Amino acid sequence: PVLGEASLIEGVARETVIDYMKGQYSASKIVVAAAGNVDHEVFVKLAEAAFCDLPEEGIVTNEPTHYRGGEYREARELEQVHVVMGLEGIAYKDPDYYPMSVLSTLLGGGMSSRLFQEIREKRGLVYSIYSFASSFEDGGIFGVYAGTGRNEVTELIPVMCDEIQKLTSSVGEDELARARAQLKAATLMTLESTASRSEQVARQLQIFDRVVPIEEVIGEIE
């Protein structure tokens, strides 16, 4: 089941949920954002009414994260095999955040990427493959996901590793320019809906304590 087993939910005590809520859901940790034809004063009053009962500060202090490698396998009676390979990434305030985003786009961001061309188009080993870069306050994950069949997984994993290793040798100017253009286009497309705009504003305020101009983001990508 997508949401977990009933036995897991039954094993969670009510007090545990309440303590988690008190620790994580506080006024200092929440950003409420809106985009579009919004009356600011009305919006502020609605937000205050909805969240006025929250405590000002949370009571939980998160421990710093430490990356550690490992391997996890889960056997199921399925025809498909899902493979995820993760490496230590970087925090969202790291100066290399945008270069990492460009690198992820080059490696596995779409049909023109290295992973798609080599592993799906040329070798036909997967039905889906892409890279991802997830950044957090004090670290991150850079990885690759692939969906394949049981008979292909043994050949697939070494090829995935090889494509990641190739990033350390050389990157052509043409594919670098293509990755930058693709990432810039995707970034600009987030401005086309009010939902995406409000989500972006909230995320930037929570991370950087300011709204980052789109021109600044594009400049970092370039």
Regions of interest found by a model, annotated:
Residues 114-122:
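Short amphipathic alpha-helix segments
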Residues 104-108, 117, 162, 203:
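Generic alpha-helical structural context detector
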Residues 1-58, 62, 73-74, 78, ...:
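Charge-rich, well-structured scaffold segments of protease-associated domains
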Residues 59-114:
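His/Glu-based metal-binding/catalytic segments typifying zinc-dependent metallopeptidases
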